[in-house]
Design a protein with these regions (language model features):
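Signal peptide processing junction and immediate N-terminal pro/mature segment
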Residues: 33-43
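Active-site neighborhood of HAD-like aspartate-dependent phosphohydrolases
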Residues: 45-99
Length: 288
């Protein structure tokens, strides 16, 4: 059996990371919240007041929106390399692993491969990458453990604190292509205070298929307009908006490490209902 020393180390580091992140967000807010900022915040809350009464639940994209998949996968690769003496470009490996996500998903949609959950898709991509990066000598158990690195992703520093605030007023749930086991394990690992776990797996489709958004809305509210899709990606939000869900863009400029353009506030202007710089900002704009 593989020992969970890496997970224990990561869990400890993750707790320190979250605590430091929440503290820094809190201190920064306290130190810079001038009267002008207070006025702007009050104005923002006022503009969104209509949403506060109508929205009952917020559902969240997870990869990139709630958690830093890139930094987490790089670190997991570095731990594996250190343990096994593997010298690899783990930054490139992480980008390639995520980069294979949409093309492999499309093979399911086109019928080239049978329906497969995200753990299965990640494993298909991983098998190819191990060959491409000439990484050898791993047992089946070690490969499976590495594939579950996606269960052990770190949250963005503002995520836990912001979710806790939102939870005080709204139902908060995942709505991710990640499978239920992955999202549940990640939630426990990262300390994410979800009220429930909703996954595309439950509907036999991947986002942005309509069945995912409408399925979640049916479970959480009498109408789609009572559910707010929250994501860092405009394609996700546009798909939800077309089906009547409310939408919130939370910008994550560092999702791709600055190597690829992330969606910005300007992309969402006049399209989404709420634009926030992070989850603490979103909580404030949603009246919590």
């Amino acid at each position: 059996m593989i020992q969970d020393n890496d997970q224990a180390d990561l869990s400890s580091g993750r707790r320190d990371f979250i605590a430091a992140g929440v503290a820094s967000v809190t201190l920064a807010a306290a130190g810079t919240f001038s009267s002008a900022a207070a006025s702007a915040a009050d104005s923002s809350v006022s503009r969104n007041a209509g949403l506060h009464g109508s929205v009952k639940a917020l559902v969240f994209d997870v990869f990139g929106t709630v958690v830093d998949w890139r930094g987490s996968i790089i670190r997991e690769g570095e731990l594996l390399g250190k343990r096994k003496g593997i010298n690899a470009d783990w930054v490139a490996f992480a980008d390639a692993w995520r980069g294979g996500y949409q093309p492999t998903m499309q093979k399911v949609r086109s019928g080239q491969i049978a329906w497969t959950n995200i753990d299965g898709l990640h494993r298909i991509i991983l098998n190819d990458l191990l060959r491409q990066f000439n990484i050898n000598g791993l047992s089946e158990e070690e490969i499976d453990h590495f594939n579950r690195a996606w269960h052990r992703l770190w949250p963005w520093p503002d995520a836990v604190g912001g979710l806790q605030r939102l939870k005080s007023r709204y139902i908060i749930s995942t709505l991710s292509n990640g499978n239920v086991a992955l999202l549940t394990n990640m939630g426990k690992y990262a300390g994410l205070p979800w009220d429930c776990i909703l996954s595309a797996e439950l509907f036999g489709h991947y986002k942005p298929d309509p069945e995912v958004y409408l399925g979640a809305a049916k479970l959480l509210g009498p109408s789609p307009s009572q559910v707010m899709m929250t994501a860092a990606h405009m394609d996700d939000l546009m798909a939800a908006k077309k089906l009547g869900l409310r939408t919130a863009l939370v910008t994550r400029p560092l999702e791709f490490g600055g190597k690829r353009r992330a969606d910005t506030a300007e992309d969402g202007e006049g399209i989404v209902d709420v634009i926030a710089s992070d989850f603490m900002d979103l909580a404030a704009k949603m009246g919590t």
